[in-house]
């Protein structure tokens, strides 16, 4: 198991993340975090651990720098999707990950940035899983999302259910909307986050393919 803190740079920005690669991984999942969250998110780290046990590598990354973490940037989907693409390009170049099929896991506003990134990507992405996502924030890109997309929403998260139902109708590829009974937006109820991890693992393993 490789466990490493990595730094991803371009001419203007430096991002920091956790790269974890189990032996003989089936693929790698890039986590696109939601508002006010990052690589230390306990919920996303829980999901990542379950993916590791299922033979999937992960990259959890802070999409915003410390200087950028003021409130308006957490809803700047254009900026966040650019960072998802920046991290994806790094994965496509790193010798440890470039041969791995790439998928995205997005939470809250991070789901919107992942969906927009897929629609804009010049490389292959195998699948997307959204946990309590806000795909409505990337509405104009949804018809261009043709990769298999799983939308997971808590059964008690009523406003977000409606947003995901509307987004589901707009998505341009294979898709599934799953409501997890008894779960609220953060999936804090016993057993609900375990269901998220289980469904995500199954979806990724089902749809992983060699990148273009």
What are these regions (language model features)?
Residues 6-100, 186-191, 195-196:
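Serine-hydrolase catalytic machinery in alpha/beta-hydrolase-like enzymes
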Residues 103-106, 131:
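Short beta-strand immediately N-terminal to the catalytic nucleophile in serine-hydrolase-like folds
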Residues 106-114:
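Gly/Ala-rich beta-loop-alpha elbow adjacent to hydrolase catalytic centers
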Residues 123-135:
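A conserved short beta-strand
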Residues 145, 151-153:
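Short beta-strand/loop motif that positions the catalytic acidic residue
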Residues 158-163:
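Conserved alpha/beta-hydrolase "acid-adjacent" motif
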Residues 171-186:
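Catalytic histidine neighborhood in serine/cysteine hydrolases
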Residues 191-212:
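Catalytic active-site module of serine/aspartate enzymes centered on a nucleophile-bearing elbow/loop
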């Amino acid at each position: 198991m490789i466990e490493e803190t990595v730094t991803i740079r371009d001419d203007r920005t430096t991002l920091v993340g956790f790269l974890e690669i189990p032996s003989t991984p089936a693929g790698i999942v890039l986590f696109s975090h939601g508002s006010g969250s990052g690589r230390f998110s306990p919920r996303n780290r829980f999901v990542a651990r379950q993916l590791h046990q299922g033979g999937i590598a992960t990259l959890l990354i802070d999409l915003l720098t410390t200087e950028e973490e003021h409130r308006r940037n957490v809803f700047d989907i254009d900026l966040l999707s650019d960072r998802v693409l920046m991290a994806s390009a790094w994965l496509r170049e790193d010798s440890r990950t470039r041969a791995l099929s790439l998928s995205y896991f997005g939470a809250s506003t991070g789901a919107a940035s992942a969906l927009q990134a897929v629609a804009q990507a010049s490389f292959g992405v195998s699948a997307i899983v959204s946990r309590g996502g806000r795909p409505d924030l990337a509405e104009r890109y949804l018809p261009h999302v043709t990769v298999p997309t799983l939308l997971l929403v808590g059964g008690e998260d009523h406003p977000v259910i409606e947003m995901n139902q509307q987004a589901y109708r707009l998505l341009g590829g294979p898709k599934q909307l799953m409501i997890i009974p008894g779960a609220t937006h953060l999936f804090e109820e016993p057993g609900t986050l375990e269901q998220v991890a289980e469904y995500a693992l199954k979806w990724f393993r089902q749809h992983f393919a060699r990148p273009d």
